[in-house]
Curated annotation (Swiss-Prot):
This is Small ribosomal subunit protein uS9. SUPFAM superfamilies: Ribosomal protein S5 domain 2-like. It holds the Pfam family Ribosomal_S9. GO terms for cellular component: cytosolic small ribosomal subunit. The lineage of its organism: Bacteria, Pseudomonadati, Pseudomonadota, Betaproteobacteria, Nitrosomonadales. The keyword Ribosomal protein applies. Keywords: Ribonucleoprotein, Ribosomal protein. GO terms for biological process: translation. It comes from Thiobacillus denitrificans (strain ATCC 25259 / T1). Belongs to the universal ribosomal protein uS9 family. InterPro entries: Ribosomal_Su5_D2-typ_SF (IPR020568), Ribosomal_uS9 (IPR000754), Ribosomal_uS9_bac/plastid (IPR023035), Ribosomal_uS9_CS (IPR020574), Ribsml_uS5_D2-typ_fold_subgr (IPR014721). PANTHER family: RIBOSOMAL PROTEIN S9, SMALL RIBOSOMAL SUBUNIT PROTEIN US9M. HAMAP family: Ribosomal_uS9_B.
Length: 130
């Protein structure tokens, strides 16, 4: 499989995606399922295709993705980040376009940890005056 593929690793929240790109007809396969079947929501599919639409490469590459961890939104973001990195690995000339759209930067936002004495990360226990 390593043959003539370009590779990119994408991360978002707790999801990690390994993306392999090669010249082809535009098929996107995520965990052995077509992208339309894997991501049930339209927003997830739009997020995944965003770097390809921006660079006018929607039907020029076959993409194979292995993604693990997190939920649907995090996985879609991780796949997008991986596709972006793989496209830059393939052709560095695409980087300014992708960078201007904010797709090259890894979204570093993570879930804030729950603190002791709180219900959640910031939700305090109810205060009783008496």
């Amino acid at each position: 499989m390593i043959g003539n593929y370009n590779y990119g690793t994408g991360r978002r929240k707790s999801s990690v995606a390994r993306v392999f790109i090669k010249a082809g007809s535009g098929k996107i396969v995520v965990n052995d399922k077509p992208v339309d079947e894997y991501f049930s929501r339209e927003t997830g599919r739009m997020i995944v295709r965003q770097p390809l639409v921006l660079t006018d490469n929607l039907n020029r590459f076959d993409i194979m993705v292995n993604v693990a961890g997190g939920g649907e939104s995090g996985q879609a973001g991780a796949v997008r980040h991986g596709i972006t990195r793989a496209l830059i690995d393939l052709d560095a000339g695409m980087k300014p376009t992708l960078k201007a759209a904010g797709l090259v930067t890894r979204d570093a936002r993570e879930v804030e940890r729950k603190k002791v004495g709180f219900h959640k990360a910031r939700r305090r226990k109810q205060f009783s005056k008496r």
